[in-house]
Amino acid sequence: MSETTGPSIDRDEVARFERIAATWWDEAGPMRVLHRFNPVRITYIRDTVCRHFGRDPRRPLPLEALSLIDIGCGGGILSEPLARLGATVTGLDPAPTNIRVAQAHAAEAGVPVDYRGQTIEAVVEAGERFDVVLAMEVVEHVVDMPAFVRTACAAVKPGGLFFAATLNRTMRSFALAIVGAEYVLGWLPRGTHDWEKFVTPAELTGAVESAGLTVIDTTGVVYNPLGGRWAMSRDTGVNYMIAAERPVA
């Protein structure tokens, strides 16, 4: 198995994101939805990590000395802010163009992130483990979700955390995330998502717990079109995030 291929990699999905790689940091471009979503993701990860590890989220570097890996990091729009919070961040992406964009932006910004054109399978096989493992907006793009989650969870150190964000497989998510976002509003390039690959909270929880972790939180995320902002919610019918922990022993 090469470092950029594996059972989790859908080459069509990789090619689709490579075609728009140059736009990762364009807040008005194809990734604008993720840019708007980013503050919610960062807050959720920071606050959950701080509660778990007994940190103060108000500190300038609340994630200092914690190792974190961002699977499917794309151009680094999540990796960089988490590195700015003090985490030692590794960003993985199987698309070489994405990695080049991420590396160039991090170098220009002066933010230390270890970007690699690797799969999580290669990292786990090499024996690397992390305090925090992220699979944000990734599980709906892989070939075999349970196998991918099992491998991603294997990268979590004892006492560490796993996070995932994805889309629920409901008629509402089809109407909003595909018909609305891709075809009516044009927020995302057409073909970005395949509704049949969306994952229900029960399916994701089952995969995570089969990998030996315990889900400690499930939170919905909703979009307010009037304010143009995303916010956490009890509503998991479309977008949601989970956090899970690996027992210390």
From Swiss-Prot:
Keywords, comma-separated and alphabetical: Methyltransferase, S-adenosyl-L-methionine, Transferase, Ubiquinone biosynthesis
Ranges in a coiled coil: none
A matching Pfam family: Methyltransf_23
Catalytic activity: a 3-demethylubiquinol + S-adenosyl-L-methionine = a ubiquinol + S-adenosyl-L-homocysteine + H(+); a 3-(all-trans-polyprenyl)benzene-1,2-diol + S-adenosyl-L-methionine = a 2-methoxy-6-(all-trans-polyprenyl)phenol + S-adenosyl-L-homocysteine + H(+)
Binding site for S-adenosyl-L-methionine: 41, 72, 93, 136
Source domain of life: Bacteria
Pathway: Cofactor biosynthesis; ubiquinone biosynthesis
Enzyme class, broadest EC rank: transferase
Swiss-Prot/TrEMBL GO biological process terms: methylation
Record-listed E.C. numbers: 2.1.1.222, 2.1.1.64
PANTHER family attached to this UniProt entry: METHYLTRANSFERASE, UBIQUINONE BIOSYNTHESIS O-METHYLTRANSFERASE, MITOCHONDRIAL
Designated name of the protein: Ubiquinone biosynthesis O-methyltransferase
Organism: Methylobacterium nodulans (strain LMG 21967 / CNCM I-2342 / ORS 2060)
